[in-house]
Every structure is written in C-alpha cells, then in structure tokens.
Amino acid sequence: MAARRRHVAAGAGAPAPAAGEWPAVTAGGGAAWALSPVEEVGTKQELMRRTGLPPRDLRALDPALSSAASASSCRPSAITGRDRAVVVNLDRARAVITASEVLVPSPRDPAVAPLVRELRARLALAASPTPAPSPSPPQHGMAVGMDGSISPSQASRGGEEAAGNGKDGEALGGGDKALPFEFRALEVCLEFACKSLEHETCTLEKEAYPALDELTSKVSTLNLERVRQIKSRLVAISGKVQKVRDELEHLLDDDMDMAALHLTEKLAYQSSRFDIDKEASELEDHSSRDEEGVEGGGGGDGDDETIAGGGSFSPNTDELEILLESYFVQIDGTLNSLSTLREYVEDTEDYINMMLDEKQNQLLQMGILLSTGTLVSSCAIAVTGVFGINVHISLYDSPASSAAFPCAAAGIVAGSLALYLAALLCYKRAGILQ
C-alpha cells in the first residue's frame, strides 16, 4: 500500500495523528503528517527520499530505541549536518530539519507535542511579513518556500527595536538579514531542549534543598531515602545536560560541522555550480564547433577563470556561531546550577558523616566506661568470693567478727570506686576519653 499523507493548514483543527507519525512543519507554519516506517514498509524509503538521510539516522530518532537508550543512560546527543538535512537529537528535542520543513517523530508523546506546537507557531510567525511601524528603511529577510526557493520578504522587529536599531541598520547597509529556515527551526529545537532541561533542574532544586535541610536536622530512614532518589535524579539530569553542552561545544569548535548546517546556502551553491557547469559545457561545445574562437583563446580563458573562481562551499558561520553560543551559555548555566546542587549534596553527606562519626565516638566512649565498670565489678566479686569460701578461720572465733563484715564490705566498695576513678583518670590522660 502506498504511503499516505494528510496536509493540514496552519491553525486549522487537525485531528490528532496516530502513534508513530512524523509531523512535517513547513516554512509557512503548515503541518503535514508523514506515516512512520512502523505502519508502512515504503514510508521509510519516502522519508529517506525527502530528507536524503541514511537509515541509521532515522533509527537514532526512533522513539522506541530512544526510550531504551534513555532508560540505560547511554542515549547520545548530537546535531549532525547531512547533505540535505540536519538531524537534531537533543534529549526530548528530536527532529529532522530540511531547507523547507521540519519532521518530528512521535508527536503523541506529551513531552514532544509542545515542540510541534512551538515549531508551528514560531515558523508561521517568522514567515508572515509585517510592515515596519517606523519610517526607517525596512529590513529585508529571506523566506524559504516549500520547494526550497528563496524569495525576499520584509520583516519588522517592532517599534522600539526598529527605532533603537535604525542607525545600526543603516551602518550595516539596510538592516539585518533574517535567519534561514533551518536556523530558525534549529533555534526552536535548542530552546525547547534547554528550557526542558532547565525546568527539570528547577524542579529538582525545589525538591532537593528542603529535603537536604530536613536531613541535616533529623537523620531518618525516610529522609535518607528521599535524598537517595534526589541524588539519582541529579546524576541523570546532569548527564543529559553535559551531553548537550558537549555537543554544542563540539559544534562551536568545528567550522566544518557548522558549515554542514547551512542547508539553504548549500542548495543555492549547488544550484549556482550546476548553472556554471551547464554554461561551461555549452561554451565548450560552441568553442569546439568554432575553430577560430578556439585559436583566439580569449573566451576560453575567461570561462576557465569563472569556473575556477567558484571555489569550494565555505559559508559564513558567524550567525550560526552566535546562535549556538547563546544556547551554550544557557545550558552551561544550567550545568553550573546542577554542579552547585551536587556540591550541596556532597556537603550534606559530609555533614551527616561527621554527625554519625560523632555518635559513633560517643558510643565507643560509653563502651569503654561500661567495660571498665565491668572489670572493677569483677574484681570486687572475686574478693567477695574469696571471703565466701567455706573454710574455718580464726576470724570467725574472734569477738570482733561481727564488726569485721561491714568493714570488709565497705572496703571492697571503696576499693572498687577508687580503682574505677583511677582508670578514668588514666583514660583522660591518654586521650581516650574527652
């Protein structure tokens, strides 16, 4: 059965897509639903034809595989530039961006649905031109259509911004150029990923700090279990944030990877190269038929210079670098917040360990006191046992034998106390007891 697609206009009440569909958000904010390879065998080939991606990139964005990788904490974060598309795999922000549309897998996922809505709203807002509220020269942008063609469109940044940036626009030669479609879509994905991670971090902080403070005041099994769960979540979120930060840092350090993300300029470059090659082949055919023109050599040299002047594809990556740097700073701030929370958890653990060590020292001191008392009591019992031996001695026949028993008992008790106090004094001098 052939693959089916339903095109839904932007803003219309479209029915919810079935599980596994890929909503395609276009440059004008419209949405079409492309069937997933789970439902149709030929749909995978259709997605590969539309995006030019290899199967491994589509498998990396598969919701089932992503869920399994996320559960095992080994899911990678990557922004990969291909020939005709950009693969975005940043935590919950998973999308395939082309020069004219954005494909998002698993739209029924509650964590992904806000990304689709944000893409439709932001891309539709960026594609709709609005008149400038001030008489300053209008700022021109580039609007990308469904077919990948580029047409100039006017954009406005609002009254205050236009008035404040009027001189800057004149200095730059007529205003700022609007970002290409793939950069606007990439910005939405980056913002969604950074905001979702920041929201998770804020939620964790609101739960962690009170729980840690309560643990320091009262060490109990319930509080320890809460802190253990918080620490597990902290490790998981820190890993995701670190992966996103590392990917942005890798892109900022590699100009070739950033150049691969310029899809619109790449299409324009390929189109211009095709025209140049076509003209060159026509001129070569014409020169081969015209032997006099070949002997002159003037036109041929000029054509060679034109072809040689084409050079390789090397776009200006300043705009993309500024875009990535802004979100790199944001995700780095989130990572710093998590690092601060991790340090607070470690400080709390150290404080709890010191409290437990203090309690353990007190128990050890109590054990020393009890052991010493037991030793002294054993000595007193030994002396009493000696006097209790059933052996007749002369003391029993003495008239003062009735007064000897209280004296002997008092002497045993006094000797035991003196021996116990002497042991405590020795312990204090040796530093065993405080």
From Swiss-Prot:
Principal location class: membrane
Chain positions covered by the region annotation Disordered: 1-21, 126-171, 279-311
Cellular localisation: Membrane
Amino acid composition bias (Low complexity), ranges on this chain: 9-21
Family: Belongs to the CorA metal ion transporter (MIT) (TC 1.A.35.5) family.
CDD domains reported for this sequence: Mrs2_Mfm1p-like
One Gene Ontology cellular component: membrane
Protein name: Putative magnesium transporter MRS2-D
Region forming the signal peptide: none
Pfam family, any one: MRS2-like
Topology relative to the membrane: Multi-pass membrane protein
Keyword list, A-Z: Ion transport, Magnesium, Membrane, Transmembrane, Transmembrane helix, Transport
GO molecular function: magnesium ion transmembrane transporter activity
